[in-house]
Amino acid sequence: MSLIIPPKYKLKLLPETTEMAIKMLKDAFQERLSKTLNLRRVTAPLFVLSGTGLNDDLNGSERAVSFPIADMGGRQAEVVHSLAKWKRVKLGAYDIAPGFGLYTDMNAIRTHEELDNLHSLYVDQWDWEKTITREDRNVEYLKKTVKSIYKVIKESESLIYAEFPHITPTLPDEITFIHTEELLQEYPRLSPKEREAAVARRYGAVFLIGIGQQLSDGTRHDGRAPDYDDWTTPN
């Protein structure tokens, strides 16, 4: 576990005020995200039955927390890692038209995480999925969507600043797009995580493209799911 607490660190908000700020931020963000991307809210499962294929295998090596269900003959259930597959099933089940989608507040447990300031065993994250046409399956549409989400993030940051002026905004006006091969060429002596940290310090907000495919040095920037991530769209 790698937890770093800066010397003489002081909380900017009292614990109870922090909870109020978290609620304000989550409420504002989900409302804006829903309107911006045409998403409807759905309730997410905390666990799914084993063997259904609905749990996200992530990189294919992580083990899910599981338990038997007594009233179902001991069938195994798994706490979700993420909802990547489940969301796509729901898009079909709800017959959601192109240009519209769903979002949920996902809670999960990931026992394999390397614990630090940013990673925990407990995951609480916004998860969303949208139906698109074949024509929209391209990098330009991806970038357009990312810019829309970033705009929501910036608006949420401004809202918090208006309520708590001592929490000053830090995000740049625009998000920077960069391919992982570009990162490799620019920082060949650094590890993938170190490259991410370096480019984030440089630009302030970055969206990485091409994470799972093989790079020119024969390595991958990071692992990606073998059974549902997009490996074919040219990028």
What are these regions (language model features)?
Residues S2-N235:
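Structured aminoacyl-transfer and RNA-binding surfaces used for tRNA recognition/handling
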